[in-house]
Amino acid sequence: MKKLFVKYVSQNILGMVGMSLYILADTFFISKAVGSKGITALNLVLPVYNLIFAIGAMIGVGSAIRYVVEKNKGDTSSESYFFHALLWCIMISVIFILIGIFIPDRLVGLLGGDSAIINTGKSYTRIFMLFTPFFMCNYVCNAFVRNDGAPSIAMCATLFSSLFNIVFDYILMFPLGLGMEGAALATAISPIIGILICCIHLCSDKCSVKLNPAVPSVKRLIYSCQVGVSSFVAEISSGVITIVFNMIILRLAGNIGVAAYGVVANTSLVAVALFNGIAQGSQPLISDYYGRGLRKNVGSILRMAVVSSLLIAALLILFICTFAPFVTSVFNSEHDARLASYAESGLRLYFTGFIFAGINIVGSAILSAVESVKYAFAASIMRGFIAITIFAFALSAAFGMTGVWLAFPAAEFVTMFIIVRGLRQLKL
């Protein structure tokens, strides 16, 4: 069992880190090509990315969990979950496409951009929103391939799509001189690579996933999303945090402060990806064991996942405390002293929260995998919306920028109590 856990988790960690490099690569190359204005524009529109990924995650992961559990129970209706998930993603994507075509400038302004930032970010926003169906469907394909016993292919899909993004970020932004538009194109095309790689498994004889046509059903969508909601909130919480923090930081420190937060937030994406890797690597195993009634095995996977998250959190905090100046300098091409000061202190304070966040991310995924929706939903709402918003406003009012950075660890600490209570209720 330990070997199986290591196989699934290690491959999912690599895959999720690869996915996080979508934004990190954009941040790095944009900082070199456009400077702090580009980072600010990117950070303001990140919540839109988060929303797109969150919807794809909720539908994809939720449908994949229902598929595995029902398939193991012998329910033939499970065969239409894949088609149903893709169909809903495409239908929902139309909303994002229309916004991207007609009002990307208004969207950037609504998210806090002034006239200079709107001019910098509107074309970037338009381009990536036009490719929304591919982002969402990539998440669905990856979740089903992973849950169908092919984590290696799922990992390769995310890694190679991210590698494409990084390479073409450079090519389009520098040799071809396309600037922000080049970064958007590279990021927008990369999920197509992921989908094509997933098709290697989906079109093979080993694949048990069927593309059986189904009429779109709101009832079935909600049923799938009930167990995918923790994945939704795990993704969307980053967007909510970004919007709240941007609003507060614009008031406290202006555009330079938002650029500093961009460094902190985008670096933290890699950390979140590590914990999502543990969570999503554990989830297929737990869903499988749970569907077969093997509760002892579920408990063993749970313990290994929690210990892994604590170990990774400790290593992350040690790394950031030691190398915060170096991490900041990578994104500070203009050598702005204020940006460096804000970002270095922000990294050190913000990252302490991953001791608790790791447990919360892993715990939420496990609760969803065993269909314990109540606690998974409560924890997701607490960490993604309620606690982080309350602490951000309260601590920033009391301690300024230091309070902004401390809001994340405070919110994760409070949420951890819900997760621990939910896991204890399972009596594994």
Regions of interest found by a model, annotated:
Residues 7-26, 127, 138, 161, ...:
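Transmembrane helical elements of multi-pass membrane transporters/channels
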